[in-house]
Amino acid sequence: MVSSLIYSLCAVSGLLATTVNGLPKKGHRAETSLPIVKQTKCGSHTYQYNGLVGYGTVPSNAVDKYGDTLGGFGSSIAIEQASWKKNSDGTYEGIAWAIPDRGWNTQGTLNVQSRIQKLGLKLTLAPGATVSNPSNPNLEIKLLDTLLLTDPDGTPMTGLDADFSGNISYPGFPGMPVATYPGDGFGGSGAGGRRISLDSEGIVIGNDGAFWVSDEYGPYVYKFSREGRMLQAIQPPDAYIPRRNGKVSFSAASPPIYEPDRQTDPEDPETGRNNNQGFEGLTISRDGKTLYVLIQSALNNDGGPKKRYRKQARMLEYDISGTTPKYTHEYVVTLATFVDPHEQDPSKATITASQSEIHYLPTGDFLILSRDSNAGRAAQYTESVYRHADIISKSTQTTDIKSKSNDKADGSIASSEGVLDDGINPLDYCSFVDYNLNSELGKFRLHNGGAQDEHLLNEKWESLALVPVDPSKEFEDNGKNEYFLISFSDNDYITQDGTSSSLLLFFSSASE
């Protein structure tokens, strides 16, 4: 199943002594009376985490508008802020747009059309929930619509792995990753074809209502209309583009279902993004004029692909206030690390917590979702040691690394062991919300570690969205403001009862 969690947060602008005991400014009434679970100062702002206040699920055999399994959509979510409201009975409602990644791929990537799911959310707070008196799920998630994505000509996008070499282009667009497939792209008969490969991982809504979507294959950022047609494509600097044998190679070494033994040689790109480590993080400024996109972990020219060394992740900033996106700045985020309890070699045990999402905060800082892997529901291990929504903050000391030398194909800002070059200062990184606290999870019968049961947290938490506790109030400088942080998990379409209407394909996951 796909799961969702809601946390209560407070953001305080400026250095206010009142934040120590959680008191609001004079004349500003707090909407929640929860105790402070965690308080952190990052840059010039102080933040409070007041606990888990909501939980909901979607059955793993649910289907979308087109009859395909409603899975994987926790890759990223975006809330229509104008839709978020508090009802007279104290409940909350709003509309979320959620994006799945490239589809069910346990046995190989598929020719599944990329899509966005429109969801209705309803939250009924459970203020009396405790570990000894837990609440049932209190977040309702309802499918409202499914939007299919196409290229500029209206041809469906695909989740198939991109070709080892080559690309596809259209007037006014850069060369984009393409999959050339035989038959129907599922192993059956058909005419074959070529489609843009998309492994979507991030989504935001622009001021014009269009969707910006970040991708792992390119890694690129695409703009789609409300009808799902591609309008623009942002190609990042050459340093991000994967290259094998000195040539552009968009393949992620993820063979298709009809050719599961296909080999990619070399498997890892020598430079650029590593396989399945593309643009996981995408967010937009509060005024809708600036896009930020963050690579999941270090480029292979900056310390990747080894987990021990891939902690120096690059962030790009684009001005989207005009008709054409403009690349303006580039920064470094030094990702968190943790000790892998299952690694027998102590010299290899400290590894990078790759990030799965970023979210712009009203203060100008960012939330960043960093986590471990292979721990949780249906995973190899049940206990996760690192799942956090942390904070990153840019200051006057943060280095803008945008330059021709850093952005060229083999440009590097760190050693092969992930040590930043002299003179580069990354964004401040501050620990904040810990997903794994059983003292909070238990309020909704959830747990981290222990039995493989229906209450064990899913492995892949990959999305962040922020909505106000009091939707009638705007953000006030130097004031205390309260928000719900909504996070969805990506279940990778894991199910024993899956279906794809594309060719009446029925599937189940061996890992379930």
Swiss-Prot record:
Residue ranges, annotated region (Disordered): 251-282
Signal peptide segment: 1-22
Principal localisation: secreted
Places the protein is found: Secreted
Domain of life: Eukaryota
Pfam family, one: Phytase-like
Keywords, comma-separated and alphabetical: Glycoprotein, Secreted, Signal
TM segment ranges: none
SUPFAM superfamilies: YWTD domain
InterPro entries for the chain: Phytase-like_dom
Glycan attachment points: N167
One GO cellular component term noted in the UniProt record for this chain: extracellular region
PANTHER family, sorted: BLR7070 PROTEIN, PHYTASE-LIKE DOMAIN-CONTAINING PROTEIN
Protein's name according to its UniProt entry: Uncharacterized secreted protein ARB_04696
Organism lineage string: Eukaryota, Fungi, Dikarya, Ascomycota, Pezizomycotina
